[in-house]
Amino acid sequence: MPLFATPFAQLDLVRQPEQDGEPLQAFDAADEYLLNQLHERGVTAQCRVLVLNDAFGALAASLAPHVQVTSSGDSHLGFLALRKNLARNGLDLGSVRFVPASETAVGPFDHVLVKVPKTLALLEEQLIRLHGQLAPGAQVVAAGMVKHLPRAAGDLLERYIGPMHASLAVKKARLLIAEAAERPQPRSPYPTRYRLEQPPLTLLNHANVFCREGLDIGTRAFLPHLPRSLGALRAADLGCGNGVLGIAYALLNPQAELALVDESYMAVQSARENWRAALGERPATFRADDGLAGQAAGSLDLVLCNPPFHQQQVVGDFLAWRMFLQARDALAAGGELWIVGNRHLGYHAKLKRLFRGVEQVAANPKFVILKAGK
């Protein structure tokens, strides 16, 4: 892979999770454009720079030796990538302060560099949280590849930050440059809530939660077929989102021990709040993690999973395959992985390569529910 070369540094960067023969770079032309623009503007060692949504740490690692850097995002994989790339390039792990997107990064900041996320609700919440955190004369610069940069991103900068103009495109990347101006204290529209009829739950969803306006159709297909009356099993909701699968399973299985795990900090926060609303002080574990990478081998009896099929703009089954591998390792002998997936993804064949037995629990024209036994 080529080095990421800017006026600030030349770095050897990797994506997270790493794949053998990874065809994709851990940076893009929008990262390069952001850093070139900041260098032209001029920075000193005293400059306080906030980086938002730095997918694999390219921005923060480049700036770490030169300015005071805070990085914030909603991906735990992004945090792991930042740490790995700092270490890989001989940089101090403490040179970048990381703040999960579920919390507010406290300034004041002189410069804010933003990679525009796929979910504009996350961008909106991040811009709202910048209120009161910008130094006088601060500039907020958002960037993305032109094909992934919606007009609405500029509208959000105008609304919450100040006057905005778009740059010319360079290497198919564009900047949206906003000058901080007085704005009234905004009211955030997040979290959102929706009502589920069965089981009867009101579910809270922070800004970056998948399908925050209503239950996704895969989970809707899965819910009626969750296993029940299984006793005191150790179970995990892998890729838990707002926690609906884990909560519904816990209601059906009062003795079960649950761990709700997601790589999104906002998802884990949503799951924690929804669990408390539905189940009070019943114990459970909530963890932002790289799937079940932090789970002891053989420590689970059941894993529930509605696997994702994209990472940022990249679509594929590599994340699902990795989750299946992690589930197999975390399950005890006789344990089961239950999943829902689109029919066309062929998860049945993939699971047969990892588990001793795979059964179809239910199906409809779009989705299939499978259980795989270890």
From Swiss-Prot:
Its EC number is 2.1.1.174. Its main location: cytoplasm. It catalyses: guanosine(1835) in 23S rRNA + S-adenosyl-L-methionine = N(2)-methylguanosine(1835) in 23S rRNA + S-adenosyl-L-homocysteine + H(+). One of its GO terms (molecular function) is rRNA (guanine-N2-)-methyltransferase activity. GO terms for biological process: rRNA base methylation. Keywords: Cytoplasm, Methyltransferase, rRNA processing, S-adenosyl-L-methionine, Transferase. Gene3D superfamilies: Vaccinia Virus protein VP39. GO terms for cellular component: cytoplasm. Pfam families: MTS (PF05175). InterPro entries: DNA_methylase_N6_adenine_CS (IPR002052), rRNA_m2G-MeTrfase_RlmG (IPR017237), RsmC/RlmG (IPR046977), SAM-dependent_MTases_sf (IPR029063), Small_mtfrase_dom (IPR007848). It is found in: Cytoplasm. SUPFAM superfamilies: S-adenosyl-L-methionine-dependent methyltransferases (SSF53335). It comes from the Bacteria. PANTHER family: RIBOSOMAL RNA LARGE SUBUNIT METHYLTRANSFERASE G, RIBOSOMAL RNA SMALL SUBUNIT METHYLTRANSFERASE C. Belongs to the methyltransferase superfamily. RlmG family. Specifically methylates the guanine in position 1835 (m2G1835) of 23S rRNA. HAMAP family: 23SrRNA_methyltr_G (MF_01859). This is Ribosomal RNA large subunit methyltransferase G. It comes from Pseudomonas aeruginosa (strain ATCC 15692 / DSM 22644 / CIP 104116 / JCM 14847 / LMG 12228 / 1C / PRS 101 / PAO1).
